[in-house]
Amino acid sequence: MLRFQRFASTYNQRAVLRKYPVGGIIHGFQVRRAVPVPELKLTAVDLIHEQTGAEHLHIDRDDKNNVFSIAFRTLPPDATGVPHILEHTTLCGSEKYPVRDPFFKMLNKSLANFMNAMTGPDYTFFPFATTNARDFVNLRDVYLNSTLRPLLKEQDFYQEGWRLEHSEVTNPKSDIIFKGVVFNEMKGQVSNADYHFWSQFQQNIYPSLNNSGGDPQKITDLHYQDLVDFHHANYHPSNARTFTYGSFPLEDTLKKVNEEFRAYGKRIINKKLPKPLELIETKELTLEGQIDPMLPAEKQTKTSLTWKCGEPTDLYETFLLKILGNLLLDGHDSIMYKGLIESGLGHDFSVNTGVESMTAANFLTVGIQGSQNVEEFKSKVFDLFKEFIENDVDSNKVDAIIHQLELSKKDQKADFGLQILYSILPGWTNGIDPIEGLEFDELIGRLKSDFKENGTKIFKNILDKYIIDQPYFHFTMKGSEEFSSKLAAEESTKLDKKLKELDETDRKAIFERGLLLEAAQNHKEDLSCLPTLGVADISRKVDTYDLNTNANITVRNTATNGISYIRGKKLINDMIPLELYPFLSLFAASLTHLGTKTTPYGAIDNEIKLHTGGISTNISVNADPTTLQPNLYFDMSGFSLNEKSDYIFNFLKTILMETDFSTHKDKLKVLINSIASSNTSHIADSGHTVARSFASGHLSTVAAIQEHISGVEHYKLISRLCSIMNDDKLFQSEVIDKLVMLQRIIVNSQNMEFFASVDCQAQENKIRKEVDYFVSTLPNTSSDISGAIQTACVPRYSDSQVLNLIKFPFQVHYTAQAYNGVSYTHKDGAALQVLANMLTFKHLHKEIREKGGAYGGGATFSALSGIFSYYSYRDPNPLASIQTFEKSASYVLNDAKWTQSDLDESKLSIFQQVDAPISPKSEGSTFFNLGVTDEMRQVRREQLLDTSLLDIHRVAERYILPNKSIATVVGPGIDGETVSPKWHIEDIKV
């Protein structure tokens, strides 16, 4: 039987290769190579368009989630953000689809599970993924026509890029200010301290590679004609790389691409790569940056050392460099982590730490956040390199890295095609063979034999060649309290300068242009030119999966490729005293950071990597899908090769029962500082979710618990803990004692359930025995902690706090407004979900983004928490957004002229995610994770499909129009507006 399977596999591979004969011509494309990559179960086909020289890579794989992308090399000429703004305006209408923003409008005319457009450092690409063949054709046509033949209207440049416009568009006496979607997006980016550090580092290590996203201070120097010229120069087939992945026929796509390309000739493209900073001698640079309000003043410095280490074109040396970076930096047992982070020199690595392949150079960077002595850091790094060279690398560490690489190949992901695209595109656009990068087995095999023959020498040679006694770039950024105000002053100065250059004719033109733009935004367009799917394309039946449930374990037997996935959860309702809720997330994180009385976590971590794909612990809270009552869980998970599944349970037992908080209090302090810094980055990136969670916490018990374990209450706790670290007695009583108490409460055998995904009956039997044994080794008695409370008694925020401000030193704001809705199984839940989607696509996108200039905005209904909410993202005018939110229900009932077609499009948009492909390990896990049965899912699906326009009006009138709402803004205070007592102010800082 095995012999037959091998023969069948070889036969299929040969059949695939016969489809792509080398030298053959397929619709104007010549096949240059067809390379089987058996370790990834795919064949890579390299083609070139004879007429234009455009390159196409096809990944032939038995995967129904098909991907298409078109990419262009787009070296930014300056820091005005022209590649980024072009990415936006390209999708604002084309010759074949002359409607405003066909890309956004296709989001609800499609069943694609992924649609986007992205700007990299020196390339721009437009990918999508779908399982529907007709959808694939529709989106492919829109993407090709939009990128090659966009309208590039000046009006779209003003909307998406930047413009001068009155703050009140219809009032010529109101202030003239800067507006624009990308302008505000990048102001939000600069507010993220990590992003600003990274972008300034990149700009200085690679001065010839400008900021493609755009510097807000430079964006307002860009002219419309610059945009048109940049498109003409770069969005040409000769400069394009197209990509397809999956099971759909390649010939159809090549035929369409050839039709689009044949109007073009071959253009000579400048393939010269910009060069990085020339490090003939060591260079140092210190700049000011954004302060981190969650860390104390003495921990506001980020600093790093960077060496140039060859070029990405040498694939094996680049691979070795990445392995070296892993040995030096990855994990608790790495020499740099122990010497720089565990030692307390920094609380975490800087965001640029690691190995980076950037255009024409590889870099190795070692950096820290929270440095109090930059010179001590630099000296320590040199000492650690010397120590690394003087000692042999433990072969187990190399084996662990190889094990992780090999396991990652077998770990099947639902978005595998997109992941391949992301991995190859940066190098492909700069002349690196994309297929060689897919051949992992060859690289790993060479590493194994090289390390066996030469040992540590292969890594020491790289250090000797590029690091030891070589010049480097020392980059430091010091957090400044005045940073945001200085940026605001610079913007004000630039605005004043532009305003002084205006005469009355200019001012009149600006006013009239604003009116014209608003009129265009309000104009209802004929969208009949856009291709669309219909509700009939959506199945009325949910996908179900056979499960084997016995006692406390449920097993899904499916194609896991020889991997066992284990998830466990423990219900901890009625166990946790209220004062310990904010400590729950810290407790879960501590288990995979500290270690035991006898073994540091670094040693445990290395064993975990050697034998498994990883172990994790977490806290989650879910609402009952019928009653909305909260269920609080301690979660644990891990995965490994089938033959090593027992290691998962051994490691879980070790970290649960033996983690010692007192022995490793210094590591605990490092972890707390790291969490504080991560919290700041999270708020800068996802402030709208923080605002939404805080607002929801006033209305829902589940949301209130979530706030305590991972929201504002948790942020406040972490900030307070950062301020007491130097007081050992206080730290013991306020932190360590509480974590020990949680360990006593949580670690026992009661209320434990498991879910396993395996690929054969024998492995299922093995897992069941391992679960039984694991549970039997845990204490079987409940905690003796007194004063436990019901989760339902967790206090919500006062609902009299209708307006809330969470103060952060950003340049833009994030807003949310929350309302009580209904449970997952309630008959009105589906209509509320459709209402939220229709408001997003048919109203709020126009009002919040196009008119208001925010980067994003919309409405959501969380069926699993029962909360309906509005939000805006990187918003220059949050108070106007709140007014828009408050008027939205009235708009639905009185002004919206929504049609059945509008309703159907919203259903398509919702089912993009409902029916998105899932990985084998996720099959059948919905009930285990959320308590939602297949029967509930089926009823919900039918309710979504059957929702009518009358239902939409009914739920808007019943749940949104009359109900009390809670609004929250994240960002800086607004003078004269966000003041007490009208506003409740939360100031999260040390």
From Swiss-Prot:
Its EC number is 3.4.24.-. It is found in: Mitochondrion intermembrane space; Mitochondrion matrix. SUPFAM superfamilies: LuxS/MPP-like metallohydrolase. GO terms for cellular component: mitochondrial intermembrane space; mitochondrial matrix. GO terms for molecular function: ATP-dependent peptidase activity; metalloendopeptidase activity; zinc ion binding. Zn(2+) binds at H84, H88, E185. Degrades mitochondrial transit peptides after their cleavage in the intermembrane space or in the matrix, and presequence peptides; clearance of these peptides is required to keep the presequence processing machinery running. Preferentially cleaves the N-terminal side of paired basic amino acid residues. Also degrades other unstructured peptides. May function as an ATP-dependent peptidase as opposed to a metalloendopeptidase. Monomer and homodimer; homodimerization is induced by binding of the substrate. This is Presequence protease, mitochondrial. It comes from Candida glabrata (strain ATCC 2001 / BCRC 20586 / JCM 3761 / NBRC 0622 / NRRL Y-65 / CBS 138).
